[in-house]
């Protein structure tokens, strides 16, 4: 991931820098190939997106993978500059417009993703992150989504304040950290002609796989990930509850000490002696540091994503079950005649 710095002006309204992303078919194939190659090694695939901005459309025309983090001799920033310089020499779009990464079972939202996109978006205003879900795509559903940080999330990360008060002030929740940008895939006319010719050469699909109900592993993976995220959120809730208990105990002791001081000052006043200022008592109780809620917010977003995927998967499975039952009943009725 790139580590970029920059300035970003606060914008309370929605981000209208990019309305949609148009991705070239060749760039999509490169991303898909790279992500599937790395998924076999259980590694996270990441790479740079190249293209240009036309009006409100971000056109992605090329991409290249980042070097693996295990190679300590590789300077990642120098590697990216070298690749873009060589692409420029051969008259290929070389402008950096974002980055992409692979995802497994919908586990795309993370602290690392938020941090990297913040550095990108504050230095390259129109940059996006494209997330490719390898497991869902391997089942026949191309899952390619583009995201940008919302202005509120950028301001929160810029301030470095992740307390509950900051989340309430900026009205930031897990659903408003990222904004999904519509993405379309465009091919050249020659590519479309070639795809039409190849489609005629493919054998006709009888459609048996569409009613396949043996997909328990998919639901199992989603449920396992969901249980892990719920456990993490529970641990975060326990930590925050302990913080609230400590703060409540400290406030109780401080009020008791102030009440005692007020009584002592009343006695001193009646005797004509100088009173002790309240600051002497208050400074004995240092305010407790408020725990950051960013991790809990991200975990909540992951739980919401898994719940949506499970609901979608179950609805599709139920639809397959009813269709299969109807076809089976029709087949049995036909055989009895």
UniProtKB/Swiss-Prot annotation:
Keyword Translocase: no
MF annotations from Gene Ontology: metallopeptidase activity; translation initiation factor activity
BP term (GO), one: formation of cytoplasmic translation initiation complex
Key words of the record: Cytoplasm, Initiation factor, Protein biosynthesis
GO cellular component, one term: eukaryotic 48S preinitiation complex
Chief location category: cytoplasm
Domain MPN: 21-153
Pfam families attached to this UniProt entry: eIF3h_C, JAB
Gene3D superfamilies in the cross-refs: Cytidine Deaminase, domain 2 (3.40.140.10)
Record has Protein transport as a keyword: no
Subcellular location(s) per record: Cytoplasm
InterPro entries: eIF3h (IPR027524), eIF3h_C (IPR045810), JAMM/MPN+_dom (IPR000555), JAMM_MPN+_peptidase_M67A (IPR050242), MPN (IPR037518)
Domain of life: Eukaryota
Protein family membership: Belongs to the eIF-3 subunit H family.
PANTHER family in the record: EUKARYOTIC TRANSLATION INITIATION FACTOR 3 -RELATED
Quaternary structure and partners: Component of the eukaryotic translation initiation factor 3 (eIF-3) complex. The eIF-3 complex interacts with pix. Interacts with mxt.
Role played: Component of the eukaryotic translation initiation factor 3 (eIF-3) complex, which is involved in protein synthesis of a specialized repertoire of mRNAs and, together with other initiation factors, stimulates binding of mRNA and methionyl-tRNAi to the 40S ribosome. The eIF-3 complex specifically targets and initiates translation of a subset of mRNAs involved in cell proliferation.
Protein's UniProt name: Eukaryotic translation initiation factor 3 subunit H
Origin species: Drosophila ananassae
């Amino acid at each position: 991931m790139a580590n970029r710095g920059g300035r970003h002006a606060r914008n309370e309204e929605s981000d209208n820098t990019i309305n949609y992303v148009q991705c070239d078919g060749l760039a999509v194939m490169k991303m898909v190939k790279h992500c599937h190659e790395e998924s076999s090694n259980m590694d996270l695939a990441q790479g740079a997106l190249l293209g240009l901005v036309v009006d409100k459309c971000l056109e992605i025309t090329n991409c290249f993978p980042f070097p693996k983090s295990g190679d300590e001799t590789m300077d990642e920033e120098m590697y990216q500059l070298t690749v873009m310089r060589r692409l420029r020499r051969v008259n290929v779009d070389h402008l950096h417009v974002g980055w992409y990464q692979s995802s497994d079972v919908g586990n795309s939202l993370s602290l690392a993703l938020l941090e990297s996109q913040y550095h990108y978006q504050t230095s390259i205003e129109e940059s996006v992150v494209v997330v490719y879900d390898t497991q869902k795509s391997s089942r026949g559903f191309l899952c390619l989504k583009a995201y940008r940080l919302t202005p509120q999330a950028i301001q929160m990360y810029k301030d470095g304040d992740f307390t509950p008060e900051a989340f309430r002030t900026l009205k930031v929740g897990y659903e408003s950290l990222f904004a999904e940008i519509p993405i379309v895939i465009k091919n050249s006319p020659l590519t479309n002609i070639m795809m039409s010719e190849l489609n005629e050469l493919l054998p006709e699909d009888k459609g048996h796989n569409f009613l396949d109900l043996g997909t328990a592993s998919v639901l199992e993976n989603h449920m396992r990930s969901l249980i892990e995220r719920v456990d993490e959120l529970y641990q975060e809730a326990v930590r925050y509850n302990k913080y609230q208990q400590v703060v409540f105990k400290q406030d109780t002791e401080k009020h008791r000490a102030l009440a005692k001081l007020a009584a002592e000052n009343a006695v001193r006043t009646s005797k004509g002696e100088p009173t002790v200022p309240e600051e002497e008592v208050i400074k004995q109780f240092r305010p407790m540091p408020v725990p950051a809620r960013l991790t809990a917010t991200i975990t909540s977003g992951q739980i919401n994503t898994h719940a949506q995927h499970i609901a979608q998967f179950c609805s599709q499975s139920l639809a397959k079950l009813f269709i299969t039952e109807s076809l089976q009943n029709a087949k049995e009725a036909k055989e009895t005649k």
